[in-house]
Curated annotation (Swiss-Prot):
Fe cation binds at H146, H210, E260. InterPro entries: DiOHbiphenyl_dOase, Glyas_Bleomycin-R_OHBP_Dase, Glyas_Fos-R_dOase_dom, VOC, Xdiol_ring_cleave_dOase_1/2. Its cofactor is Fe(2+). Binds 1 Fe(2+) ion per subunit. This is Biphenyl-2,3-diol 1,2-dioxygenase. Its EC number is 1.13.11.39. It comes from the Bacteria.
Length: 298
Protein backbone atom coordinates (compact mmCIF):
# COMPACT_ATOMS: atom_id res chain seq x y z
CA UNK A 1 0.00 0.00 0.00
CA UNK A 2 1.25 3.49 -0.78
CA UNK A 3 0.30 7.09 -1.43
CA UNK A 4 -2.33 7.25 -4.17
CA UNK A 5 -2.49 10.97 -4.97
CA UNK A 6 -2.23 14.56 -3.83
CA UNK A 7 -5.61 15.13 -2.22
CA UNK A 8 -5.62 18.68 -0.92
CA UNK A 9 -3.56 21.80 -0.26
CA UNK A 10 -3.92 24.59 2.27
CA UNK A 11 -2.53 28.11 1.91
CA UNK A 12 -1.94 30.74 4.61
CA UNK A 13 -2.46 34.13 2.97
CA UNK A 14 -2.65 37.79 3.94
CA UNK A 15 -5.58 38.57 1.61
CA UNK A 16 -8.21 35.84 1.69
CA UNK A 17 -10.70 37.90 -0.31
CA UNK A 18 -8.22 38.37 -3.17
CA UNK A 19 -7.56 34.63 -3.26
CA UNK A 20 -11.28 33.89 -3.25
CA UNK A 21 -11.79 36.14 -6.26
CA UNK A 22 -8.74 34.76 -8.07
CA UNK A 23 -9.59 31.08 -7.56
CA UNK A 24 -13.24 31.42 -8.51
CA UNK A 25 -13.50 34.22 -11.06
CA UNK A 26 -10.17 33.62 -12.80
CA UNK A 27 -9.51 29.87 -12.44
CA UNK A 28 -13.08 28.59 -12.16
CA UNK A 29 -13.00 26.89 -8.77
CA UNK A 30 -16.23 26.60 -6.78
CA UNK A 31 -16.66 28.14 -3.34
CA UNK A 32 -17.46 25.46 -0.77
CA UNK A 33 -18.03 27.57 2.30
CA UNK A 34 -16.00 28.81 5.25
CA UNK A 35 -15.16 26.46 8.12
CA UNK A 36 -12.52 26.04 10.82
CA UNK A 37 -10.40 24.72 7.93
CA UNK A 38 -10.56 28.13 6.20
CA UNK A 39 -12.29 29.15 3.00
CA UNK A 40 -12.78 25.96 0.99
CA UNK A 41 -12.80 25.48 -2.78
CA UNK A 42 -13.85 22.58 -5.00
CA UNK A 43 -12.84 21.35 -8.44
CA UNK A 44 -14.71 18.03 -8.48
CA UNK A 45 -16.96 15.81 -6.35
CA UNK A 46 -14.73 16.08 -3.28
CA UNK A 47 -15.98 18.37 -0.51
CA UNK A 48 -12.87 20.51 -0.98
CA UNK A 49 -9.46 20.46 -2.61
CA UNK A 50 -7.94 23.85 -1.69
CA UNK A 51 -8.24 25.67 1.63
CA UNK A 52 -7.26 29.32 2.12
CA UNK A 53 -6.63 30.52 5.67
CA UNK A 54 -5.71 33.91 7.09
CA UNK A 55 -1.95 34.13 7.68
CA UNK A 56 1.07 36.26 6.98
CA UNK A 57 3.40 33.75 5.29
CA UNK A 58 1.61 33.92 1.91
CA UNK A 59 2.68 30.39 1.10
CA UNK A 60 1.65 26.75 1.13
CA UNK A 61 0.74 25.88 4.73
CA UNK A 62 0.10 22.13 4.36
CA UNK A 63 -0.52 19.41 1.80
CA UNK A 64 -2.46 16.17 2.16
CA UNK A 65 -1.71 12.88 0.41
CA UNK A 66 -4.34 10.16 0.07
CA UNK A 67 -4.08 6.44 0.80
CA UNK A 68 -6.76 3.84 0.18
CA UNK A 69 -7.75 2.86 3.71
CA UNK A 70 -6.82 2.57 7.39
CA UNK A 71 -4.33 -0.21 6.69
CA UNK A 72 -2.55 1.98 4.17
CA UNK A 73 -2.42 4.83 6.67
CA UNK A 74 -0.94 2.57 9.36
CA UNK A 75 1.64 1.26 6.92
CA UNK A 76 2.76 4.77 5.96
CA UNK A 77 2.92 5.80 9.63
CA UNK A 78 5.17 2.81 10.39
CA UNK A 79 7.41 3.59 7.42
CA UNK A 80 7.84 7.20 8.51
CA UNK A 81 8.64 6.20 12.09
CA UNK A 82 11.19 3.65 10.91
CA UNK A 83 12.88 6.46 8.99
CA UNK A 84 13.10 8.53 12.17
CA UNK A 85 10.35 10.97 11.20
CA UNK A 86 8.16 12.35 14.00
CA UNK A 87 4.56 11.34 13.28
CA UNK A 88 1.41 12.54 15.03
CA UNK A 89 -1.98 10.89 14.71
CA UNK A 90 -4.56 13.53 13.87
CA UNK A 91 -7.25 13.87 16.51
CA UNK A 92 -11.00 13.89 15.87
CA UNK A 93 -11.06 17.68 15.65
CA UNK A 94 -8.45 17.82 12.89
CA UNK A 95 -10.08 14.94 11.01
CA UNK A 96 -13.40 16.79 11.16
CA UNK A 97 -11.82 20.01 9.84
CA UNK A 98 -10.21 18.14 6.98
CA UNK A 99 -13.34 16.10 6.28
CA UNK A 100 -11.50 12.77 6.45
CA UNK A 101 -11.89 9.54 8.39
CA UNK A 102 -8.33 9.38 9.69
CA UNK A 103 -4.97 11.06 9.18
CA UNK A 104 -1.40 11.49 10.36
CA UNK A 105 0.74 14.62 10.33
CA UNK A 106 4.50 15.12 9.91
CA UNK A 107 6.93 17.37 8.04
CA UNK A 108 9.32 16.94 5.16
CA UNK A 109 13.07 17.48 5.78
CA UNK A 110 12.74 21.23 5.24
CA UNK A 111 9.69 21.91 7.36
CA UNK A 112 6.71 21.67 5.02
CA UNK A 113 3.77 20.28 7.05
CA UNK A 114 2.40 17.18 5.35
CA UNK A 115 -0.56 14.93 6.04
CA UNK A 116 -1.54 11.46 4.91
CA UNK A 117 -5.21 10.59 5.18
CA UNK A 118 -7.93 8.19 4.08
CA UNK A 119 -11.70 8.46 3.77
CA UNK A 120 -12.14 11.92 2.25
CA UNK A 121 -15.64 13.41 1.99
CA UNK A 122 -17.48 13.13 -1.33
CA UNK A 123 -20.46 15.38 -2.10
CA UNK A 124 -22.04 13.89 -5.21
CA UNK A 125 -25.37 15.35 -4.08
CA UNK A 126 -23.91 18.83 -4.61
CA UNK A 127 -22.85 19.09 -8.27
CA UNK A 128 -19.67 20.98 -9.04
CA UNK A 129 -20.56 24.44 -10.36
CA UNK A 130 -17.48 26.33 -11.58
CA UNK A 131 -17.01 29.94 -10.62
CA UNK A 132 -16.03 30.81 -14.20
CA UNK A 133 -16.32 29.11 -17.58
CA UNK A 134 -14.50 25.76 -17.37
CA UNK A 135 -15.74 22.40 -18.63
CA UNK A 136 -14.02 20.48 -15.85
CA UNK A 137 -10.82 19.62 -14.00
CA UNK A 138 -8.84 16.39 -14.40
CA UNK A 139 -8.67 14.70 -10.99
CA UNK A 140 -9.96 11.22 -10.09
CA UNK A 141 -7.15 8.72 -9.62
CA UNK A 142 -4.64 11.40 -10.62
CA UNK A 143 -5.58 13.58 -7.67
CA UNK A 144 -5.61 17.34 -7.31
CA UNK A 145 -2.60 18.16 -9.49
CA UNK A 146 0.99 18.91 -8.55
CA UNK A 147 3.27 21.40 -6.87
CA UNK A 148 6.98 22.20 -7.23
CA UNK A 149 8.82 22.10 -3.90
CA UNK A 150 11.71 24.55 -3.46
CA UNK A 151 14.40 23.14 -1.17
CA UNK A 152 18.01 23.98 -0.26
CA UNK A 153 19.17 20.38 -0.77
CA UNK A 154 17.39 18.51 -3.55
CA UNK A 155 19.26 15.24 -2.89
CA UNK A 156 18.01 15.12 0.70
CA UNK A 157 14.47 15.97 -0.35
CA UNK A 158 14.55 13.44 -3.19
CA UNK A 159 15.65 10.67 -0.82
CA UNK A 160 12.79 11.48 1.56
CA UNK A 161 10.05 11.61 -1.03
CA UNK A 162 11.21 8.49 -2.89
CA UNK A 163 12.70 6.22 -0.21
CA UNK A 164 10.22 7.08 2.55
CA UNK A 165 7.02 8.26 0.87
CA UNK A 166 7.38 5.99 -2.16
CA UNK A 167 7.28 8.46 -5.06
CA UNK A 168 9.00 7.35 -8.27
CA UNK A 169 11.16 9.42 -10.60
CA UNK A 170 9.61 10.30 -13.96
CA UNK A 171 12.38 12.45 -15.40
CA UNK A 172 14.83 15.28 -14.78
CA UNK A 173 15.09 18.71 -16.40
CA UNK A 174 18.34 20.66 -16.14
CA UNK A 175 16.99 24.17 -15.63
CA UNK A 176 19.31 26.92 -16.83
CA UNK A 177 19.08 29.69 -14.25
CA UNK A 178 21.89 31.79 -15.73
CA UNK A 179 24.92 31.66 -18.05
CA UNK A 180 26.83 29.35 -15.71
CA UNK A 181 24.08 28.11 -13.38
CA UNK A 182 22.05 24.94 -13.95
CA UNK A 183 19.64 23.53 -11.37
CA UNK A 184 18.26 20.00 -11.85
CA UNK A 185 14.52 19.64 -11.28
CA UNK A 186 13.26 16.15 -10.38
CA UNK A 187 9.74 15.15 -11.40
CA UNK A 188 8.06 12.43 -9.34
CA UNK A 189 4.89 10.39 -9.75
CA UNK A 190 2.70 8.28 -7.47
CA UNK A 191 -0.02 7.47 -10.03
CA UNK A 192 -0.56 7.96 -13.76
CA UNK A 193 -0.14 11.73 -13.55
CA UNK A 194 3.29 12.49 -15.01
CA UNK A 195 4.27 14.26 -11.81
CA UNK A 196 2.44 14.90 -8.58
CA UNK A 197 5.56 16.51 -7.12
CA UNK A 198 8.67 18.20 -8.46
CA UNK A 199 11.74 19.05 -6.39
CA UNK A 200 14.39 21.65 -7.16
CA UNK A 201 16.94 23.78 -5.30
CA UNK A 202 15.49 27.00 -6.67
CA UNK A 203 16.73 30.06 -4.72
CA UNK A 204 13.22 31.28 -3.92
CA UNK A 205 11.74 32.49 -0.61
CA UNK A 206 8.55 30.40 -0.90
CA UNK A 207 8.05 26.72 -0.06
CA UNK A 208 6.76 26.10 -3.57
CA UNK A 209 7.33 27.68 -6.96
CA UNK A 210 3.85 26.82 -8.21
CA UNK A 211 0.93 24.45 -8.00
CA UNK A 212 -0.84 23.04 -11.06
CA UNK A 213 -4.46 22.46 -12.03
CA UNK A 214 -5.28 20.46 -15.17
CA UNK A 215 -8.48 21.22 -17.09
CA UNK A 216 -10.49 19.23 -19.60
CA UNK A 217 -9.99 21.22 -22.80
CA UNK A 218 -7.67 23.60 -24.60
CA UNK A 219 -10.49 26.15 -24.66
CA UNK A 220 -10.60 26.00 -20.85
CA UNK A 221 -6.94 27.05 -20.85
CA UNK A 222 -7.50 29.78 -23.41
CA UNK A 223 -10.50 31.33 -21.70
CA UNK A 224 -8.71 31.30 -18.34
CA UNK A 225 -5.65 32.87 -19.94
CA UNK A 226 -7.78 35.78 -21.15
CA UNK A 227 -9.44 36.21 -17.75
CA UNK A 228 -6.10 36.25 -15.92
CA UNK A 229 -4.38 38.37 -18.56
CA UNK A 230 -7.07 41.03 -18.19
CA UNK A 231 -5.64 41.73 -14.72
CA UNK A 232 -2.01 41.55 -15.86
CA UNK A 233 -1.23 38.47 -13.75
CA UNK A 234 0.30 36.21 -16.42
CA UNK A 235 3.87 35.25 -15.48
CA UNK A 236 4.60 32.88 -18.36
CA UNK A 237 2.98 32.75 -21.77
CA UNK A 238 1.27 29.72 -23.27
CA UNK A 239 3.68 26.89 -24.00
CA UNK A 240 4.12 23.11 -24.11
CA UNK A 241 6.45 21.31 -21.72
CA UNK A 242 9.10 18.87 -22.89
CA UNK A 243 8.51 16.27 -20.20
CA UNK A 244 4.75 15.93 -19.61
CA UNK A 245 3.76 17.63 -22.91
CA UNK A 246 1.20 19.79 -21.09
CA UNK A 247 -0.01 22.96 -22.81
CA UNK A 248 -0.23 25.60 -20.09
CA UNK A 249 0.39 29.09 -18.83
CA UNK A 250 1.58 30.39 -15.47
CA UNK A 251 0.08 33.19 -13.40
CA UNK A 252 0.74 34.92 -10.10
CA UNK A 253 -1.63 34.30 -7.21
CA UNK A 254 -2.30 37.22 -4.84
CA UNK A 255 0.49 35.84 -2.62
CA UNK A 256 3.11 35.67 -5.34
CA UNK A 257 3.11 31.86 -5.45
CA UNK A 258 2.43 30.89 -9.05
CA UNK A 259 -0.23 28.61 -10.50
CA UNK A 260 0.13 26.57 -13.68
CA UNK A 261 -3.12 26.04 -15.57
CA UNK A 262 -2.87 23.36 -18.24
CA UNK A 263 -4.33 20.70 -20.47
CA UNK A 264 -3.40 17.41 -22.13
CA UNK A 265 -0.47 16.17 -20.09
CA UNK A 266 0.71 12.70 -21.02
CA UNK A 267 0.56 9.99 -18.38
CA UNK A 268 3.00 7.48 -16.95
CA UNK A 269 2.41 3.75 -17.47
CA UNK A 270 4.36 0.59 -16.72
CA UNK A 271 6.45 1.00 -19.87
CA UNK A 272 7.79 4.40 -18.73
CA UNK A 273 11.57 4.87 -18.55
CA UNK A 274 13.36 7.75 -16.85
CA UNK A 275 14.87 10.35 -19.20
CA UNK A 276 16.37 13.83 -18.88
CA UNK A 277 15.80 17.12 -20.70
CA UNK A 278 17.87 20.25 -21.29
CA UNK A 279 14.87 22.56 -21.62
CA UNK A 280 11.53 22.74 -19.79
CA UNK A 281 9.49 23.68 -22.86
CA UNK A 282 9.22 22.73 -26.53
CA UNK A 283 7.82 26.17 -27.31
CA UNK A 284 6.38 29.16 -25.48
CA UNK A 285 6.41 29.66 -21.71
CA UNK A 286 8.18 32.99 -22.17
CA UNK A 287 8.62 34.78 -18.86
CA UNK A 288 6.67 37.99 -18.26
CA UNK A 289 7.09 37.84 -14.49
CA UNK A 290 8.29 41.42 -14.10
CA UNK A 291 4.96 42.70 -15.41
CA UNK A 292 2.97 40.45 -13.06
CA UNK A 293 5.11 41.44 -10.06
CA UNK A 294 4.53 45.11 -10.77
CA UNK A 295 0.77 44.50 -11.06
CA UNK A 296 0.68 42.63 -7.71
CA UNK A 297 2.53 45.46 -5.96
CA UNK A 298 0.07 47.97 -7.39
Amino acid sequence: MSIRSLGYMGFAVSDVAAWRSFLTQKLGLMEAGTTDNGDLFRIDSRAWRIAVQQGEVDDLAFAGYEVADAAGLAQMADKLKQAGIAVTTGDASLARRRGVTGLITFADPFGLPLEIYYGASEVFEKPFLPGAAVSGFLTGEQGLGHFVRCVPDSDKALAFYTDVLGFQLSDVIDMKMGPDVTVPAYFLHCNERHHTLAIAAFPLPKRIHHFMLEVASLDDVGFAFDRVDADGLITSTLGRHTNDHMVSFYASTPSGVEVEYGWSARTVDRSWVVVRHDSPSMWGHKSVRDKAAARNKA
